[in-house]
Amino acid sequence: MRDTPLSNCERLFLLKAIKEKKRLDGRQTYDYRNIKISFGTDYGCCVVELGKTRVLSQVSCELVPPKDSRPTEGIVFFNLELSPMASPAFEPNRQSELLVTLNRQLERCLRNSKCIDTESLCVVSGEKVWQIRVDVHVLNHDGNLMDAASIAAISALSHFRRPDVAIQGRDVTVFGPEERDPIPLSIYHMPICVSFAFFLQGSFLLVDPCEREERVKDGLLVIAMNKHREICSIQSSGGIMLLKEQVLRCSKIASVKVSEITELINKALENDKKVRKEGGKFGFAESMPKERITTLKRDEAPVEMTDVKETADDIVQRTETTTETVPSPILVATGTAQIGEGIVNSWGLDEDEDDELQTEDRKTDEVVVITDSEEEEVVILNDQKSKKTSKQK
């Protein structure tokens, strides 16, 4: 694991802020960061966001032979992975001390606490049992990976559904979700880890430390507890000596935090179950906030609606068509009818057209006087008549 160096100025600034009971993100000493739990479209897929720390948990199952020491119990397997995508400090394909510690702590919290009924996972004693595999992937590391991993793992186990089976003799039939409804796991309680970081030789205490606060810590205490105030595991690291009063104080704080987180998990499970039952949209895509560009957004212009009715009435009155009187035919004789008697004749010409016709008639009645110049330009069409007139002269 390649640790990113922390400058002395940053270290001194963090320790000075902790002495003054201040934190980088504005939280109080015992405050958790915002926790968001969302489930995928498939059962057993869960993403937990603890501030900027993001963890994905996926649960799967398969039929395997049981262990020789426990032929009537199923198998629960946990696997936690740290990829360079989460932090540049994580090296690929190499088990670091942090990875081994997190895996052991997760198994001690969930498997050794007997929170899952492993006997209900037995299909055929000594032959077939269900193996439940929990894969936890760290998507982004911003401190307190243990708490986020425990919340994601127990939420995914509570959300998971295994296929139903039928046994006829030695034949085992596994039904798909279309044939029979999947069966949820039998979970007795929900153990959740709560981390406490100690600074300056145990003089100061912080709950849910972030990544920078973890770099300057002197010791770490992780308490796994359920909402019934039952301690499932306790682990201390860092080589710091803690007093009995400090441990009891941390356990009281952990009981309050665990009850709040358990209520949040149950609420998220109920909401997902309700949405699936109603046939609504569910999955990671619906839980992610939609970020849209709002630079070109225009504010709605105010519209006055006071005189709308009056103007509408005026428009209707203007556009109303005038009722035309249609004459009824008058029967003059057999086979002859007269239409339009007693109505003004609309076939006549307009006054302007009458004026134009009168002016044209006046122009045609006028006498045209032809001058000498115009006589020379006259073309004679009949040659014979012109010859006779010349002889008489």
Swiss-Prot record:
The keyword NAD does not apply. GO terms for molecular function: mRNA 3'-UTR AU-rich region binding. Gene3D superfamilies: GHMP Kinase, N-terminal domain. Keywords: Cytoplasm, Exosome, Nucleus, RNA-binding, rRNA processing. Residues 1-268 are annotated as: ARE binding. GO terms for cellular component: cytoplasmic exosome (RNase complex); nuclear exosome (RNase complex); nucleolus; nucleoplasm. Disruption phenotype: Morpholino knockdown of the protein affects brain and neuromuscular development. Morphant embryos have small heads, small or absent eyes, truncated bodies, and reduced and damaged myofibers. Motor axons fail to migrate properly to the neuromuscular junctions. The brain has abnormal morphology, the cerebellum and hindbrain are absent. One of its GO terms (biological process) is U4 snRNA 3'-end processing. Pfam families: RNase_PH, RNase_PH_C. The keyword Nucleus applies. It comes from the Eukaryota. It is found in: Cytoplasm; Nucleus; Nucleus, Nucleolus; Nucleus, Nucleoplasm. Belongs to the RNase PH family. Component of the RNA exosome complex. Non-catalytic component of the RNA exosome complex which has 3'->5' exoribonuclease activity and participates in a multitude of cellular RNA processing and degradation events. In the nucleus, the RNA exosome complex is involved in proper maturation of stable RNA species such as rRNA, snRNA and snoRNA, in the elimination of RNA processing by-products and non-coding 'pervasive' transcripts, such as antisense RNA species and promoter-upstream transcripts (PROMPTs), and of mRNAs with processing defects, thereby limiting or excluding their export to the cytoplasm. This is Exosome complex component RRP45.
